[in-house]
Amino acid sequence: MSLTEGAHTKWGVLKQKLGPQDPDQIEGNLENADPELCIRLLQIPSVVNYSGLKKRLESSDDEWMCQFLELSGLDLLLEALDRLSGRGVARIADALLQLTCINCVRTLMNSHKGIEYIVNNEGYVRKLSQALDTSNVMVKKQVFELLAALCIYSPEGHALCLDALEHYKVVKNQQYRFSVITNELSSSDNVPYMVTLLSVINAIIFGTEELRNRVQLRNEFIGLQLLDLLTKLRDLEDEDLLIQALVFEEAKSEDEEELLKIYGGINMNNHQEVFSTLFNKVSCSPLSVQLLSILQGLLQLDQSHPTSPLLWEALEVLVNRAVLLADDCQNNNVEEVMDRLVTSKKLSSKEKRKTDKCTNKVNKSIQTDKPKEESCEGKTVKKDPVSSGIPADSLQLLDALLAPPTKEDSPACITPLHTHLSGELTCSSVLPSPPSPLVPNADERISSSSSPLPPPPPPLPGTELSPPPPGMVALSLPPPPPPLPGMGGMLPPPPPPLPGMGGMLPTPPPPPLPGMGGMLPPPPPPLPGMGGMLPPPPPPLPGMGGMLPPPPPPLPGMGGMLPPPPPLPGMGGMLPPPPPPLPGMGGMPPPPPPMPGMGTFTDEVVVARVDYSLGYLPKAFLKVNKPTLKMKKLNWQKIPPNVIKDSHSMWASASSIEDTVEPNYSSIEQLFCLPQAAVKESAVPVKKPPKEITFLDSKKNLNLNIFLKQFKCPNKEVIELIEKGDRSRFDIEILKQFLKLLPEKHEVENLKSYQEDKAKLSNADQFYLLLLGVPCYQLRIECMLICEEINLMIDMIRPRAKVVSSACDDIISSHRLPLFCQLILKVGNFLNYGSHTGNANGFKISTLLKLTETRANQTRITLLHHILEEIEHNHTDLLQLPTDLENVSTVAGINIENMYTETSGNLKKLRDLQNKISTAATDVKEQYEKSIQDCMDTLKELEEQLTDISQKKVKLADYLCEDPTKLSLEETFSTMKAFRELFLKAKKDNKDRKEQAVKAEKRKQQIADEETKRQKGENGKIIRKGAAKLEEGCIIDDLLADIKKGFQLRKTAKTKTKADACPKTLSSETNRTDIQHVGKRPEVPPVHPQRKIIILKRQ
């Protein structure tokens, strides 16, 4: 086949794959397929296979669906969805494949068999939640819809949904379980997707029948700034969004009202009110000490710390358990109460910690993943049930906080570890030799134990044995008669061989270490898993010496002696040397296994050095001439010596030739040497010019030079500016800095006593000499500074004083404020009728800020909202009250006390300067006397303005019925500003609520019109689409339709009180019956044995 024909063939195949296909070919190929064929096709993910499967699922009966589920069809779909989500959506084909796959899952859940199978088998919802880790918004929308439907379907589905969100939080390392929902809601601009997210929030809240659980779930969302998000979402003015937001707010207000009834009018969602109630409850009792200690401890918890959420969740669990035990621990002490608080989780937590230690060691050695269920003593550690509702990590942290401390260095466990999957995996092994110690962990060092030697032969000094850690490359002893290197005079003359070694060994004798023979007491045999996983060899027969086959590699790391050099090859136990051999040297055919290193154990890797035995001449090293200079390098790649030795190469043959070519090393050294650094001749020292003379320290000299450079003129001009009192080139900061740099007394004396050439002085010293020639230079600079400061202060304070005075007049002269306060007074007396706060003649002005704290029975309506509605209908002019307070709001934030302080302080400075000027030189008097007097006159006028403000403050206090000595103008203006903002916000809220009500009414009318247009049955009743869908088995679609409309959620929210009063089982059965419209729950397909194996492996 030519190249052109091959290209045409490839393009043709690609065209067939990418070109349009027949719809029957895409979706009709699985119309009558059996479950086995569908399972096979699912193993090849494609749009064609998923589309055909979706159509087959829609037309399947219960028997076909059961077979499909038993054959792990749902497992294949969820696994494929998880893998596709991990790819991202870099290609359109992957996005389409994800959508078709999730549509198959939705179609399967639409059937009774499918959704019941998912609800009754844990793990599927977790797998489904992992598909949220994708950038495909359509796929995430479908997954969230399925989670919302599961929450409403049954309590079991609600628990599985919460467990899946908790699992997703752990997998993605998020801080809160609902963060995935709120993060998507805040970052998305897709309105349908935001509607789905809000519906998930409502479904999670309405999925539980317990009031406290609903409030807790809702508060979790509120803690993630959901209320702020709802305010932004209302601005989008989408009908579906408004429905979900309205459902959330209505249910919130109804639950809050129910809580008020239960807790006697205490708003349990208000932190301050709950704390005040608790404080008043225990303030007059000894329990207040414990409350204070608890609060002090909570205050120490860092909110930004990563473990802070876990600590707060654990404390919440502990408090809930304490509430349950409050009536049943009268005769217990503190220790018994603590044991009861954690008794349900304490044992499992200990077992879990012990199991984790063991399995960690096993997993490190065998390099496998940690099983889900394992125990250290043959018992299975099971996870908490999903229905508990308490995060597992919180319980673990709670147990860790309350459990007694344990020693870190204690042995984890010494008994064999049995698991369900691998039979026998040992965390540690019991050694067969009685005197050998137990080793808890192969990775840990074991303390050495001294072993006394028997009398014959004499003991080796410093030979202390301990079971060594693995990983050391052992070194063998050279044959005698030479002494062991590194031992020096420590060894006595070699003793004669001990026949049999029987009298020196205990019974039963453990196997000897190679190279040690009978001179040392035997150490324990190698641990299983440390020496190739081989069992220890049997002990040698007496008198056999080195005739036994070699034992397995010995235990490395025998501490107490220095490691000997490597052995000479060929010195096996079968060819003993002429002198008597060391006992135990035999049994090792060449090359012998290395013996344990006898030095102190370190973590370094010891590499054995290659040496040669007697009678074997090693290859002589090549003789290389050493250059006398540093040479340039030749970049080559060396061939290993063993390669040259073992092969018939050119290098091996060239080395045997006698006639060799010698290079001219001297010429090479001259041509290829590195350049040498030239020796510098000693330079003749040059005389440095004499330095400038200065009487200032280096720091002050530098600062003064920097100060003078900013003028960019000679020093004489700066002095002339000071003499003339010209402030055009001086500002306040420069004058303050100038005062700090004035010469001190000793500097003045040194400069005046200097009689030599002035030109030799530094620039700073010369400036000081010029400055000293100006009479009263410091007083002149102080006068310039005070004049600048007073002019600036007057420009700032005078307009502020004017505005404050005007704000006082606005409050007193406003005719709308008294009318509004009279209206509030009447409403307040009506609400407080019969109480000690009723029948009031007036109220503090700060009460205006509390109008929003009194909430109505309807959502988002406070007392201020209602009063503004009344004003809008009956007193329209009062709506202009914010215009009367506009100037007052601008004054808020001005520090009036600071104005008094600055004015009085500057007046005092001016009087002091006047006294100094009166005794100064004549030219200074003429120059600054008038300026200082003008400043004093201006400050006196400002002081009169402040006095007028003080008088108006007294009038305002009398107008507001406040104490003049305690009234603060700053607080009064801030209160008016905050009230004005609340007034405007409530006015806007009323307007928005009316517009939303009009839209909601139009939508209701539109739905009612659609209901009337529907087809009617024989009895004249409307045939509802929901009932028809339920008969066809479309459970998910029906639930999502009700969630989208808000009808089911509103009905659930309105009947919460009745549902809480009913038994839990009754309400659950009623909910299930309403959803399924059948009197009996469908049968759940049994889990196939193969399916159980798959689940076990995945866990």
UniProtKB/Swiss-Prot annotation:
Keyword vocabulary terms for this entry: Actin-binding, Coiled coil
Residues of the GBD/FH3 domain: 1-330
Residues in coiled coil: 907-1019
GO molecular function: actin binding; small GTPase binding
Disordered, as annotated region: 348-391, 432-509, 1000-1019, 1064-1085
SMART domains (alphabetical): Drf_FH3, Drf_GBD, FH2
FH1 domain mapped to chain residues: 426-569
Example GO biological process: actin cytoskeleton organization
Domain WH2, chain residue ranges per copy: 1037-1052
Gene3D superfamilies according to UniProt: Formin, FH2 domain, Formin, FH3 diaphanous domain, Leucine-rich Repeat Variant
Residue ranges with Pro residues bias: 452-499
Basic and acidic residues: bias regions: 348-359, 367-385, 1071-1083
Residues annotated as domain FH2: 621-1009
Similarity section: Belongs to the formin homology family.
Name assigned to this protein: Inverted formin-2
Organism annotation: Xenopus laevis
